[in-house]
From Swiss-Prot:
Methyltransferase that adds a 2'-O-methyl group at the 3'-end of piRNAs, a class of 24 to 30 nucleotide RNAs that are generated by a Dicer-independent mechanism and are primarily derived from transposons and other repeated sequence elements. This probably protects the 3'-end of piRNAs from uridylation activity and subsequent degradation. Stabilization of piRNAs is essential for gametogenesis. S-adenosyl-L-methionine binds at D78, S114. This is Small RNA 2'-O-methyltransferase. Its EC number is 2.1.1.386. It comes from Rattus norvegicus (Rat).
Amino acid sequence: METAENIPCSMLGDNFKEVCAEKVIRFRPPLYKQRYQFVRDLVDRHEPKKVADLGCGDTKLLKLLKIYPCIQLLVGVDINEEKLHSNGHRLSPYLGEFVKPRDLDLTVTLYHGSVVERDSRLLGFDLITCIELIEHLDSDDLARFPEVVFGYLSPAMVVISTPNAEFNPLFPTVTLRDADHKFEWSRMEFQTWASQVANCYNYCVEFTGVGTPPAGSEHVGYCTQIGVFRKNGGKLSEPSASQQRDQHVYKAVYTTSYPSLQQEKVLKFVLVGELLIQVDRLRLRHQRMLREQEKERGPKPWYTDSSPAPHLLLGAVFTEAEKARIENSPKPFCEGEKFYIPLQRLLTYPKLHRLCADEDRMRSLIADSVCLSSDGSAVVVDLHNSWDYRPEDN
């Protein structure tokens, strides 16, 4: 829950001793986190594929956005090249993202440059965010900003946040919230500017904010005011021939690509690993069944109604339809000391089916990593393989 409360200045350090009779505002969660969460909620709802953060600074927002599976291109632009160099590492893939890769490719790039310069590599984006950016622009740059962002880049959606000057009297000794701010607008000033921009470039705009004022001060509005611009018609317009000409004025400072299941090497690695786990589970179960048969001195089929259902070996819960597909597929079998698991059987297990739904495709991906039967229809392993992995013991 978002809250704002008055805290005595003496609780916040020596910097405020001269105004200790005053109160200051503390937001929970912190205001910057509320702004980032607002963007994350938009991404959840609209699932953009291409997202750019103008004035990305320390790249904290980009780091939060890179986890979203819908995003395939994530770009940050900032005028401070040193910040980009020092924070690029935040966006590198973690080890876990190689072990459990994304479904879709993701490329992350940081550019050094001004947000009022045109660069054709930012054309065709679904979402552009400008979080606490415009108040840092001087009057000339502010005048150029709408034409570049809304006119030239023309994304499907733009989010702009900026301080609400009407909230400032609630802070002790505050005129502008940052020494680099060139201005801070009231709600009327921001909404007038934003509405004019929207009308000029064929957008609609809605106003909201984050940072709820403390009780008794509701009349000042949110601490941070936000405009959400959506392109009328809901579709991205095709760049014109002149726009499509390469205009690369930004300097690429950092770029990285994430492993994904769209990359054949990655898909093969994950598929083979999951397949070997499933094969070993079935092999171990068959060994137990043979031991039980020896004890009872009577032959039994590989699977009976009284034995544990094969789908339970996966350590997961399945729908009735999934169980039926597994149980109705070709059964594993033995020939001497060799254990055969049909590919059609393996394809019925949801984890493997998600990775590969086609028998021919699975065969081509695993052929040089596992032993296949002479006709290529089954994986073949030694029944009494000494592999130490025991997934059912976990």
